[in-house]
Every structure is written in structure tokens, then in C-alpha cells.
Amino acid sequence: MKAFLILEDGTVFEGTSIGSTREVISEIVFNTSMTGYLEVLTDPSYAGQAVTMTYPLIGNYGVCYKDMESQKAWPDGYIVRELSRMASNFRNEDPIQKFLLDNDIPGICGIDTRALTKILREKGTMNGMITTNENYNLDEVLPKIKEYSVKGVVRKVTCSEKYVLPGKGPKVALMDFGAKKNIARSLNNRGCEVTVYPAYTKAEEILATNPDGIMLSNGPGDPKECVEIIEEIKKLYNSNVPIFAICLGHQLMALATGADTHRLKYGHRGANHPVKDLKTGKCYISSQNHGYVVDESTLDSKVAVTAFENVNDKTNEGLEYVGKNIFTVQFHPEACAGPQDTAYLFDRFMDMMKKED
């Protein structure tokens, strides 16, 4: 069946339908990872977006459900050059086409994803429609495509109630703004008892449990939309509990302490982004998935200082908070998918909690 990707600038790509045949309008982004497509599909940070995979062949090792980073797939749509018809992997359980169908994700394959990525790179992230309707009217659909905006996605992806992953070590409160499983797993593997809280939990409820540390997770959308959450993070900041924040959590902590954020032209999404530790001068390859960054020009040096920067575009990749046991990073030290170069940051968080004891 034919499928069409219509961008808000009027560009149309014709290809073949994959997954669900329902029509969808979404924000079109691209990911440069060569592997890890299942982790990408199950990353809650993609809620409200349709993701383009720049690597040309997707699905060649099938689907292994143990590799999922959440309970379901989150992107609105999926765009690939070629979808593998056969999977070669002893861990394979299902073809990716079945996974897309089971999760009701519409997609398109057989288009020039390099050309699409160049458009997004040059013009910036834009909205688009995936449809199987061959009789679409461009004049009618373009206004609808342009009207779309990503809203309310943190409330959509967060857990409905708190739950506990038992452990005999430090007690960590993890605020779930769209947390990938490997954040809790990385803490759990280090012996932590992890209590996962819904995104809109009051700070008083969390602090009443006397946690040894607080983790602010990744998540989707514009951080400035999370007004209620930012107010609670202000209270967490004023406590003496060690805090480690990743991605959206990093942005929310910055907003809670008076800094600002802005949108990137086309975002950082992939498993090959170099970041530099400004204290040691060392560079690491990191996994990233964000469309917003902290604006360094708005930082108060008495509150926070830059700890990491992006080697490619010099944007902020991490902060250390002055006089506080708080550090935050824009990238994903938990990876999945991606390199484990910065997993040591979880050990640093462990050391912070032990010192507090």
C-alpha cells in the first residue's frame, strides 16, 4: 500500500506503508543511531513525535522484548529507508512490522531518508503528516499540519502510581517524567532501592520518606510547559538531598533555579554525540535525545556552573550546582541504546549519597 509523508513546507515523499494505516500528524525528527531501533521506539521521550531513522536498514535483527525501555512504543510515526523483511538474530522474537502493528504506529518506508534529514537539518524540525490517502488535498492538509504542537506529553508518559524496585542499598526517589527502564536498572544494579514516583508528585510526599537521593528522569516535550513540576523541583533543590538529573530533568532543574531553555534547530538524537567534561578535559561519546537545551547565557554563576559541553555545537550538556550535592546532564549516561562511556556518573551519584550518610 502506498503511503505519503507530507511536510509543513509542502514537500511530499511517496513510499510504502508500514505498521498501522491510520493517519497521523506529528513533529518530524531524526535519529542517527545505527542500532538500537527498539530502544528508540520504546523511549518515552519520543511521545508526540514521528522519528526518522537515518541508518538505511532497520529491523535486520528483529525485536527482543527484553530490550524495551518502557512498556510500549511511544512515537506517533516511524520513517525508514528500508524495513528488513527477515531478521537474523538468535534473540529475535518478532519482526519489527508486527511490533509496529501491535503498537498501532503508522509508518512509511522506501523514501529517501537522507534527503528528508537534509531538509530537517537545513530548515529545522517541522511538522508532517503520514497518510495512506492517495487523494489528499495539499491545500486542506497543510494548515492542519502547521497547527500541530507537542503538548501534555509528560502527563501522558508518566507512571500512574508509585512503585518500588527493592534493594538493600541507598533509597532513591526517581521522578518519572518519561523514564527509560535503564535509569532505574542502573541504580538497582548498584544496590539501590528505587521508588518511582509519578511526575506530578508533591515534593513533600517524596521528602517525607527521607530518601538518600533523588533522581530526575528524562522525558518528552518543552520543559517550560511543566510549570507545576518546576515548582516542586524548587522545593527539592532547597532540601539537602543529593540530586542527579538527566535530560528533561536537567532542563527542569535549570528552570527551577532561574535559568532559561531554548529550542534547538533540529535537536540532538543519536548514539554518537561527543561531550566534553570541562573539569578533566576528557571527551566521551554519549547517547542523546533532546530538542531543547539550557541557555548558558542565563546561568547565574553563584547557582550553577557548566560541567559538560557538546563538542559539535558547544551547547550545554551538564551543570554542577554551587554549594549543593546536585549535578545534572543533558545526555543519557544510562544509554540504551548507545555507548556506556558515561555510566560512571551513576557511581558518582552513589558516592554523593554515601557522603551524606
Language-model-detected regions and their locations in the chain:
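A glycine-centered loop/beta-turn motif at secondary-structure junctions
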Residues: 318-357
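Catalytic beta-strand/loop cores that center a nucleophilic Ser/Cys/Thr
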Residues: 282-323, 357
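Cysteine-nucleophile active-site neighborhood
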Residues: 218-285, 293, 338-353
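RNA-binding accessory domains that recognize and position tRNA/RNA substrates
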Residues: 1-204, 208-209, 223, 336, ...
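Short acidic/histidine-rich motifs immediately flanking catalytic phosphotransfer sites
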Residues: 208-216
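Beta-strand-turn-beta hairpins that frame and shape the catalytic cleft
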Residues: 167-172, 280-283, 321-326
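Active-site glycine-centered loops adjacent to acidic/histidine catalytic or metal-binding residues
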Residues: 112, 247, 290, 332
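Proline-centered loop/turn at the N-terminus of a beta-strand
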Residues: 106, 171, 242-244, 260, ...
